[in-house]
């Protein structure tokens, strides 16, 4: 996929379907953010009476016989002194939506004068590219006649030398191949994206990139490893579970290793603690954590980062049936810790627990980061724009927060309240899998933390229940699967671990 190109000269630009022109907002009025020919000013000067240049505002105009592009989009970037990376990201995502609805395929984008901004040309271009790439996406549909919007096919960014721009654009395109993989997996029918399908995708990645190795455990191997919690959740499903291990060796001589774990519940009915229909209808997205890990590995291998990373995906359906695991029963995890089942709809933490135990036994991790659409309580707490995360290590938490801020993928650190751990008490087992009806996200994280046992490994848990899937478009993401987390984690690993 090569979509974005850079061109230093305005005069030498190629003909295109559309031109995007940037504007600041000053005193509630639009102010030109770049110098253009008088022919273009004649096109847009009358439109400025109804266009203020505020963040993300657009105006769609038609050119004339003297303009090289016949469609012109005015794009507001807000006050120049307040522009941030997120402003740029969301503005160019909005412009991409407008351009695609106008059925444009080739686009010229004129950069604003960046020297007066608080951040670098590189940061501006990175966020511009991310905005365009994020909304140049179609989720899978099943119409008899395809009604999807056409893609942008060539976007030329003017005002930057190719040596600088093209390097940034190639990197972002590689990164978004991972984002698109994550989105496609989450958006596709649950009957298609089974545990076996996730395993097949992991195998395909290992076949594509020599730096990746893959190991797949079937039900028999899962039982042999004594992963009783994953096996319990899988009991009621007609589809077979899989335990997927991906390994990336980007720095073989280093002992530093990051383990990424993704919850892979390919459909969650709630089990015998059956979800109501309205809550179940989107549950094909309950494997978004697994899809995020696969997307990260796609980008990681493509970018050839000099780090060592292991990805672990416990994958199963949580189905209702006569063989399904039961509330009130006790099941034993990989290390011998026993769990009384208070709800079969709290299954994600069970399979993550066995994955954490596996990582500690076999991977010698420096840090563990897990991704899971784990609790509705997190959606109540932070909504759909911010993912909550928990961490037992302040350095890891600080670095994740910084990567979040710099990519626009919002994370907010939540507290591991030690007092709440007592809510997991069981009279007949080492713990229950649910607490009381309060602080549900915190008690879920505390449950996972118990499976670290006495290991001092740095650990973070990202609850992406609200951010992984949106039922309406919310910039800079399209409708449905967002691919949230891929960009943030790649940036985190590149900035803080690739040394």
Curated annotation (Swiss-Prot):
Pfam families: Peptidase_M17, Peptidase_M17_N. The active site is at 275, 349. GO terms for cellular component: cytoplasm. Keywords: Aminopeptidase, Cytoplasm, Hydrolase, Manganese, Metal-binding, Protease. One of its GO terms (molecular function) is manganese ion binding. It is found in: Cytoplasm. Binds 2 manganese ions per subunit. The keyword Protease applies. It catalyses: Release of an N-terminal amino acid, Xaa-|-Yaa-, in which Xaa is preferably Leu, but may be other amino acids including Pro although not Arg or Lys, and Yaa may be Pro. Amino acid amides and methyl esters are also readily hydrolyzed, but rates on arylamides are exceedingly low; Release of an N-terminal amino acid, preferentially leucine, but not glutamic or aspartic acids. It comes from the Bacteria. Mn(2+) 1 binds at residues 268, 345, 347. Mn(2+) 2 binds at residues 263, 268, 286, 347. Its EC number is 3.4.11.1, 3.4.11.10. GO terms for biological process: proteolysis. InterPro entries: Leucine_aapep/pepB (IPR011356), Macro_dom-like (IPR043472), Peptidase_M17_C (IPR000819), Peptidase_M17_leu_NH2_pept (IPR023042), Peptidase_M17_N (IPR008283). Belongs to the peptidase M17 family. NCBIfam families: PRK00913.1-4 (NF002074), PRK00913.2-5 (NF002078), PRK00913.3-5 (NF002083). This is Probable cytosol aminopeptidase. It comes from Chlamydia trachomatis serovar D (strain ATCC VR-885 / DSM 19411 / UW-3/Cx).
